[in-house]
């Protein structure tokens, strides 16, 4: 292992990819040695001296540890763009979040953030629709969107699934999606479910005068089957597909993004399984990195947490994810381990707040996120005492109250669906 990777005076070039890591050296290893091994293992080096690594090549491609704070257990490393296949998320992660997570020389390593250079951003298309395109697709410009997940998660047959979706639509939902673990099971086949639900979505549009979007899950065993399912939806007249981004894998997601553009379909990203490597604050990969990769690849909307619901995520973490979704230029924030990122005009993603939400939480959601959020409810709609239609209606009523600055209690006086929801979910 070379010893010249510590380069505190180095100023990253515009073409460098920069990463921030949290590192905890194992007992008996000093901080600088751990940082050196991390930088080398994630780029050009190995555990011992390599005869095939010429001085010229090493000087050209070596990483630069330009920031090291032992007290904060933080290092920043600048990598030459030549180390990467610029349009490949799997290759980038294999380098900066690959073997380094398994090294014995450190007890914990966490990739906190990646700042992508212009050359890499230019290799990606970003979202095809993005936030503005989704608003145009749905025909709603001035309020949050209301969505739901068909519940129960699994077990309904295709006919019942479509009926629950229809009731959600006529009650006021803009979007209805499959649950993340529903794909093509025997009790509810993908093709039959898609046909029936899209037909009832069209019926709900004609009855309500609003656009209604069904987000059918195309996550599949192979990329070939995933694309076949996507094209099946396209032929049925769908506008959307959803995909479980972590179980599917980054190669599958990049493939889907390319094919979805040709098909003219928007992409909804469900982040299930992300906590396997994002939740531990000392080891793995941050959700911030996952969100940035999603925008880079070009997903149109992404689950980011709720602050007020059942999912893990502090308010500042969720809002940092929101910023990476919607801002064109994200400023650096050392206290939050955020590197400056210029998205260079890539379209913003639509943030999705989902997980343990009820209509009573809508004022808080609106206060936290503003209008540019998709508020997505599961049990908060389908557990309404008056049924799914009333549950969706209660959500729209709560949103209308929030937009007008009226308390839910006052608005509920003339809206029985909301009044019933308050009786069930409002904390006494």
From Swiss-Prot:
EC nos: 4.1.1.39
BP terms from Gene Ontology: AMP catabolic process; carbon fixation
Site positions (Transition state stabilizer): 310
Cofactor descriptive note: Binds 1 Mg(2+) ion per subunit.
UniProt cofactor(s): Mg(2+)
Sequence positions that bind substrate: 153, 271, 303, 354-356, 376-379
InterPro entries noted in UniProt: RuBisCO, RuBisCO_III, RuBisCO_lsu_C, RuBisCO_lsu_C_sf, RuBisCO_lsu_fd_N, RuBisCO_lsu_N_sf
Keywords: Carbon dioxide fixation, Lyase, Magnesium, Metal-binding, Oxidoreductase
Catalytic activity entry: 2 (2R)-3-phosphoglycerate + 2 H(+) = D-ribulose 1,5-bisphosphate + CO2 + H2O; D-ribulose 1,5-bisphosphate + O2 = 2-phosphoglycolate + (2R)-3-phosphoglycerate + 2 H(+)
UniProt enzyme class: lyase
MF GO annotations: magnesium ion binding; oxidoreductase activity; ribulose-bisphosphate carboxylase activity
List of residues binding Mg(2+): 177, 179-180
Active site: 151 (proton acceptor), 270 (proton acceptor)
Top-level division of the source organism's lineage: Archaea
Pfam families recorded: RuBisCO_large, RuBisCO_large_N
Residues modified to N6-carboxylysine: 177
Subunit record text: Homodimer or homodecamer. In contrast to form I RuBisCO, the form III RuBisCO is composed solely of large subunits.
Misc. comment: Because the Archaea possessing a type III RuBisCO are all anaerobic, it is most likely that only the carboxylase activity of RuBisCO, and not the competitive oxygenase activity (by which RuBP reacts with O(2) to form one molecule of 3-phosphoglycerate and one molecule of 2-phosphoglycolate), is biologically relevant in these strains.
Known role: Catalyzes the addition of molecular CO(2) and H(2)O to ribulose 1,5-bisphosphate (RuBP), generating two molecules of 3-phosphoglycerate (3-PGA). Functions in an archaeal AMP degradation pathway, together with AMP phosphorylase and R15P isomerase.
Protein name as catalogued: Ribulose bisphosphate carboxylase
Organism: Methanosarcina mazei (strain ATCC BAA-159 / DSM 3647 / Goe1 / Go1 / JCM 11833 / OCM 88) (Methanosarcina frisia)
Gene responsible for this protein: rbcL
């Amino acid at each position: 292992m070379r010893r010249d990777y510590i380069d505190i005076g180095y100023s990253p070039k515009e073409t460098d990819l920069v990463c921030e890591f949290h590192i905890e050296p194992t007992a008996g290893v000093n901080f600088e040695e751990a940082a050196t091994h991390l930088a080398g293992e994630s780029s050009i080096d190995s555990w011992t001296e390599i005869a095939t690594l010429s001085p010229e090549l090493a000087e050209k491609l070596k990483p630069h540890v330009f920031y090291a704070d032992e007290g904060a257990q933080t290092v920043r490393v600048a990598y030459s763009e030549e180390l990467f296949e610029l349009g490949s998320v799997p290759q980038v992660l294999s380098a900066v979040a690959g073997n380094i997570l398994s090294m014995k020389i450190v007890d914990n390593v966490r990739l906190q953030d990646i700042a992508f250079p212009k050359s890499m951003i230019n290799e990606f298309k970003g979202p095809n629709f993005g936030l503005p395109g989704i608003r145009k697709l749905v025909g709603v410009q001035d309020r949050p969107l209301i969505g739901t997940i068909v519940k129960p998660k699994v077990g309904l047959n295709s006919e019942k699934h479509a009926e629950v979706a229809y009731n959600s639509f006529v009650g006021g939902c803009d979007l209805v999606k499959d649950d993340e673990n529903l794909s093509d099971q025997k009790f509810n086949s993908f093709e039959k479910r898609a046909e029936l639900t899209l037909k009832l979505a069209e019926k709900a549009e004609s009855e309500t005068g609003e656009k209604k979007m069904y987000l059918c899950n195309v996550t599949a065993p192979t990329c070939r089957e995933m694309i076949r399912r996507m094209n099946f939806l396209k032929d049925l007249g769908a506008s959307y597909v959803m995909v479980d981004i972590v179980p599917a894998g980054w190669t599958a997601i990049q493939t889907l993004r390319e094919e979805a553009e040709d098909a003219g379909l928007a992409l909804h990203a469900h982040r299930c399984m992300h906590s396997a490597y994002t939740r531990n604050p000392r080891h793995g990969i941050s959700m911030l990195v996952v969100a940035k990769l999603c925008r880079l690849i070009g997903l149109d909307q992404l689950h980011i947490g709720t602050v007020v619901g059942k999912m893990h995520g502090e308010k500042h973490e969720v809002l940092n994810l929101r910023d990476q979704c919607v801002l064109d230029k994200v400023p650096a924030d050392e206290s939050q381990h955020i590197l400056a990122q210029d998205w260079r005009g890539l379209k913003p993603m639509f943030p999705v707040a989902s997980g343990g939400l009820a209509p009573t939480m809508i004022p808080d959601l609106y206060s936290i996120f503003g209008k540019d959020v998709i508020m997505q409810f599961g049990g908060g709609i389908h557990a309404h005492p008056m049924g799914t239609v009333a549950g969706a209606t209660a959500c729209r009523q709560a949103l209308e109250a929030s937009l007008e600055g009226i308390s839910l209690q006052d608005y509920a006086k003339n809206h029985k669906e909301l009044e019933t929801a308050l009786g069930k979910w409002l904390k006494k």
